[in-house]
Design a protein with these regions (language model features):
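N-terminal pre-domain/capping segments
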Residues: 1-90, 94, 129, 163, ...
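Charged helix-capping and loop-helix junction motifs
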Residues: 40-44, 79, 83, 114-122, ...
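Acidic/histidine-rich catalytic cores of soluble enzymes
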Residues: 26-27, 123-210
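Hydrophobic faces of well-ordered beta-strands that scaffold small-molecule active sites
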Residues: 3-7, 27-29, 56-61, 101-103, ...
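Acidic-and-aromatic substrate-binding clefts and catalytic sites of carbohydrate-active enzymes
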Residues: 6-14, 30-44, 108-115, 142-147, ...
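A structural motif
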Residues: 24, 93, 97-98, 189, ...
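Active-site acidic/histidine proton-transfer and metal-coordination neighborhood
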Residues: 68-163, 243
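H/E-rich (His + Asp/Glu) clusters that bind or coordinate divalent metals
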Residues: 215-216, 223, 228-229
């Protein structure tokens, strides 16, 4: 398993500063704006990452908030334009060497049928394949993908040609047991967003020897998972930025003692 952080955890710190100031083995890049897709900027990020020995596993688009409007619209021309727009992401990913594109999808109240959703996802999935990119559906609570039943239907409809990002805090918010999710979808999970929790907060830094993190990692081991697991936290919930890197350290230690 590969462990790292999401640069989103330190938002709004500039991404290049996160990479330059903190040596981590792996990371997920959160693109925050249009100019960060410019080849000159992306090459700069790649150089900084290489100098720090950082492998970029995945990227997360700032347009995830617009995916319902762009990709799951009733206006076909907007959908086609949105598909073309994603080429900018995939070209940037090719420069970075990132292989996994994190996808949220439509909101729960989306206007399209489930089958239409699956077919549109497949268009983006197939475009990603042309660039050597895996478009991976994340289980986001506020989206249709927050439902395991929906994901199961999606996998069946697309004949198993679906990759998933598993986010354990999103599972908590949806009332879904993390262990049950892993057991159900293990063959399709290619990437993980991970955080800890308390009775009072569903997204906290990873505590030393956290029982729930140890259980999750043990289950992932049993299922043969070998992909990435990146710490994804919300900066406004942190007492200090160092909590992100302490979480990574605690995550690695939890894996080693399992």
């Amino acid at each position: 398993m590969q462990f790292g952080i999401s640069t989103a955890s330190l938002y709004p710190m500039l991404t290049e500063e996160v990479l330059a100031e903190h040596a981590v083995p792996c990371c997920e890049i959160f693109f925050n704006t249009l100019s960060e897709l410019a080849p000159s900027y992306v090459r700069k990020l790649k150089k900084i990452a290489d100098q720090g020995g950082i492998q970029i596993l995945s990227t997360h688009p700032f347009t995830c908030a617009f995916e319902p409007f762009m990709l799951f619209t009733g206006y076909d021309r907007r959908f086609q334009d949105a598909i073309e727009w994603h080429k900018y992401y995939f070209e940037a990913m090719n420069i970075l060497g990132a292989k996994i594109f994190v996808f949220h999808g439509d909101r729960k109240q989306g206007i399209l049928s489930e089958h239409a959703y699956f077919e549109r996802f497949a268009v983006l999935r197939d475009l990603g394949k042309r660039f050597g990119i895996t478009v991976a559906q994340e289980n986001v609570e506020r989206c249709r993908s927050g439902s395991p039943d929906f994901l199961e239907k999606m996998i069946r409809y697309l004949n198993g040609d679906v990759a998933l990002v598993f986010d354990n805090k999103q599972a908590r918010r949806a009332g879904v047991d993390a262990i049950a999710f892993v057991r159900q979808f293990a063959p399709y999970i290619c990437h993980i967003h991970i955080s800890d929790c308390t009775d009072n907060c569903d997204c906290t830094p990873i505590a030393p020897h956290s029982p729930q993190i140890c259980l999750l990692l043990n289950e992932l081991k049993k299922m043969g998972y070998e992909g990435g697991a990146v710490v994804e936290l919300y900066r406004n919930l942190l007492q200090k930025d160092e909590d992100v890197f302490l979480s990574l350290q605690n995550l690695v230690e939890a894996y080693c003692i399992n």
